[in-house]
Amino acid sequence: MTKPVVAIVGRPNVGKSTIFNRIVGERVSIVEDTPGVTRDRIYSSGEWLTHDFNVIDTGGIELTDAPFQTQIRAQAEIAIDEADVIIFMVNQREGLTQTDEMIAQMLYKTNKPVVLAVNKVDNPEMRTDIYDFYALGFGEPFPISGSHGLGLGDLLDEVANNFKDEEDDDYDEDTIKLSLIGRPNVGKSSLVNAILGEDRVIVSNIAGTTRDAIDTEYSYEDQDYVLIDTAGMRKKGKVYESTEKYSVLRALKAIERSNVVLVVLDAEEGIIEQDKRVAGYAHEEGKAVVIVVNKWDTLDKDSKTMKKFEDKIRQEFQFLDYAPIAFVSAKEKQRLRTLFPLIKEASENHKKRVQSSTLNEVITDAISMNPTPTDKGRRLKVFYATQVAVEPPTFVVFVNDAELMHFSYKRYLENQIRDAFGFEGTPIRIIPRKRN
């Protein structure tokens, strides 16, 4: 099930980024101790009461023909297009402006829920000065103060009231839900077409739960797959291709609905920072991952080329050290058969459970080989561990003091668990918890 997307829209300097940071709080920072992943602050996740959602901050829209403003407006339109609910922000101190009215006209055409937020209402006496904003035609304005955090509860209540109840994907539990992600022009579309043309049976094209997404069902060697949002991967256009910050919205929706994510790289162009950012989304969502190096046919190769490229990937994607790597050519339909065993194994490991007794034997042996650390004279004591979840496999380790388990020792225990049980293709989570 995908989380709703909330876009914050308005002219410059009305306080959009301040409200964005208020809503997402510390979630704007990266998952702790995840080296090598960068997170763009323009997009993050938020929580309100029982609701999880994604929120996107957009650039300020102005009445100008400046070239950069054309790009900002295009980016905002993409964010609006992908959003389920829009927060339209205005500024009480500056009053209603012509630009506000222009943005309102743009939002009328979307036929989407719009919640009007009047920012910089820093004390109750100022609430009487917001009535001019009724003229924008979006109903009751919600007075807020980004700098003081006032009024956010009422605003988010109204935002959440506009979330649609979305049903889970109606796919069999054994069906592997698969998405492809990667920066523009790495060959995702070609890979989709090549996969669907490789000894497959297409069952049907059906509408996914994500608005206007098309999923494609197919089978390979008695395993059913669903390729999530093939329409999104095939969607072209200079605006989407050139505004990567915003076009990731659709990719993130696909990731949320997937079991396994194929991170597609370009063998010819090599690895760039954007590749790591895109891959980081799949890792942070806890999805099983297979790294796919496409366009392998374009390289002049010798016996060492593949090993050198793999070493480079391991160096650049340290946070994905669990992910297997496949080298393929979608264009030439080379080595595509190597993908499916990796996808299937990653999916199985993503759902794997281990017995507590065997797990604790592994933990005990690990501690005997490498004793727990000390800090200021206090030694970490590990009492026992248990698996509490799958997708991804998640383990709680009960200890005397959770703060004594440093990242390096947590990583050591993870490696020992991997050595004992496998888990190739899936992240695993280890949560230290103080025993009561």
Curated annotation (Swiss-Prot):
Gene3D superfamilies: 3.30.300.20, P-loop containing nucleotide triphosphate hydrolases. It comes from the Bacteria. The keyword Repeat applies. The keyword Cytoplasm does not apply. Residues 352-436 form the KH-like domain. InterPro entries: G_ENGA, GTP-bd, GTPase_Der, KH_dom-like, KH_dom-like_a/b, P-loop_NTPase, Small_GTP-bd. GTP 2 binds at residues 182-189, 229-233, 294-297. SUPFAM superfamilies: P-loop containing nucleoside triphosphate hydrolases. Keywords: GTP-binding, Nucleotide-binding, Repeat, Ribosome biogenesis. GTP 1 binds at residues 10-17, 57-61, 119-122. GO terms for biological process: ribosome biogenesis. Residues 4-167, 176-351 form the EngA-type G domain. GO terms for molecular function: GTP binding; ribosome binding. Associates with the 50S ribosomal subunit. GTPase that plays an essential role in the late steps of ribosome biogenesis. NCBIfam families: GTPase_EngA, small_GTP. Belongs to the TRAFAC class TrmE-Era-EngA-EngB-Septin-like GTPase superfamily. EngA (Der) GTPase family. This is GTPase Der.
